[in-house]
């Protein structure tokens, strides 16, 4: 996966006869997380960071490569009912990743101040930090117990994750971008069970 991202970066930088147009910006949004595990459910999170666009107008007008570096949360939870004690047990974790997407996209100019765009490509997640806790509920009384201070350092979760994603959206006045995206995790986030991230995101960006 790392070799693929490096190859895309080097490939775009090595085009000698193309007018390369760099644009930098900031982005933030909401993550609606899900997982493929039977007993696991996702939690709503967020993403915030910086992005860059490399326009390639001499290749095809509207073609571009999109890069990002974002702090992104991908929370999960799972529950269990203990019949012997009539207690509901729930584990919750909020892992935070450095999310690095590399997408190839195309912009469709609808008017001077309005464009539609679509992009797709791979991403890499690098686990940074995140706590896990257990909540025990008996009747109307709930007790929270810390389980792990860092799910990655304690090796409860895999630190590296990767997958494929796409984005569609609109660009207003050449600066504001509103987008909806979806990421398919291709790697299990645990060693001993097959649980993969699925993330729907809604984001707003400002590109200079």
Residue ranges and their predicted role:
Residues 20-53, 115, 127, 138, ...:
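Short glycine/proline- and aromatic-enriched beta-strand/turn motifs that initiate or cap beta-hairpins
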Residues 22, 58-63, 174-180:
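Repeated loop/turn-to-beta-strand initiation elements of outer-membrane beta-barrel proteins
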Residues 196-208:
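Outer-membrane beta-barrel "beta-signal"
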Residues 35-42, 74-96, 127-161, 165, ...:
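Extracellular/periplasm-exposed beta-strand and loop segments of Gram-negative cell-envelope proteins
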């Amino acid at each position: 996966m790392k070799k693929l991202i490096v190859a895309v970066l080097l490939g775009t930088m090595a085009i000698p006869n193309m007018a390369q147009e760099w644009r930098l910006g900031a982005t933030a949004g909401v993550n609606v997380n899900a997982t493929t595990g039977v007993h696991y459910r996702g939690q709503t999170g967020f993403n915030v960071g910086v992005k860059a666009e490399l326009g390639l107008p001499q290749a095809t007008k509207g073609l571009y490569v999109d890069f990002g570096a974002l702090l992104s949360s991908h929370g999960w939870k799972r529950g269990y009912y203990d019949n012997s004690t009539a207690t509901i047990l729930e584990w919750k974790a909020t892992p935070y990743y450095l999310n690095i997407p590399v997408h190839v996209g195309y912009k469709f100019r609808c008017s001077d101040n309005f464009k539609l765009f679509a992009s797709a490509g791979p991403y890499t997640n690098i686990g940074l930090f995140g706590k896990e806790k257990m909540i025990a509920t008996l009747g109307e009384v709930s007790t929270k117990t810390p389980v792990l201070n860092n799910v990655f350092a304690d090796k409860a979760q895999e630190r590296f994750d990767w997958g494929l994603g796409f984005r569609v959206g609109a660009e207003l006045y050449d600066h504001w971008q509103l987008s909806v995206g979806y990421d398919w995790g291709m790697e299990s986030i645990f060693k001993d069970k097959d649980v993969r991230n699925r993330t729907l995101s809604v984001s707003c960006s400002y590109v200079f």
